[in-house]
Amino acid sequence: MNKTILTCAVTGNLTKPEMTPYLPITPKQIADACLGAADAGAAVVHIHVRYPETGKPSMELDHYAEVMHLIKAQNKELIINLTTGPGGRYVPTEGDPKVFAPGTTLCDPLKRVEHVAALKPEICSLDLNTMNSGADVVMNTPSNVRKMAKVIREAGVMPELEIFDSGDLNLAKDLIADGTVDGPGLYTFVMGVKYGLNTDPATLLYMRDQLPSGALWAAFGISRAEFPIVAQAWLLGGHIRVGMEDNIYLEKGVLCESNAQLVSRAKRIIGDLGGQLASSNEARQMLGL
């Protein structure tokens, strides 16, 4: 039986500090969270960064560089996956939707990948969704995705294609067909975002069955769906992700105090089902890094 790759997404950009006092915010806190997750069984860490003074999402190269330096100083084997998600949110002005409202983060797509070009992590995310997100809209147009993918390829980084709905997978197939992205690809299904993929087994089975032959895939669930999707993904032959980007509760009403706790819970679930987690080096071989 193949081992399972566990990714830990330690902070994200939508989880807010006021939601939990345990959210990693500073570069050192984020790096320490990654190292703790690795000790608990994570083979990969998915990293966003924040402004240390406010906890708000950052796109600053120096913040990413400091986190990576702190991780590599203590753990050179851990696979680092940097986000490219920030920079795609549009908030319309009430009464004049042509005008951006506060909260809009839209920027040049090349700005969204400049840290990837500079730091060259082994993996980075590449969101393929254009969708409603609460009262806002997330926009990743095919042309912008292609511009970002070109930079990612030139940096020698593997893109992790994040899929929020079935149409995103059709875009991924087009990117492979025209040579923008190498096939069969690495995919992550994002389950439970409002107006995105549902968290029922039938949805995950359908998405898995639409993948190109030979594709590697993972899935994760948002909030209360986190641990059910751990089990569903494993049962369907996929890899898994947990972390405070996606969920801040260990159980109903009980905040997790660390990302390592979430990793440990997922590890136990996989073990109870008869599986084993892959080490970072084993994951590296499985992914062809």
PLM region spans:
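Structured C-terminal cap/extension of enzyme domains
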Residues: 205, 209-210, 231-289
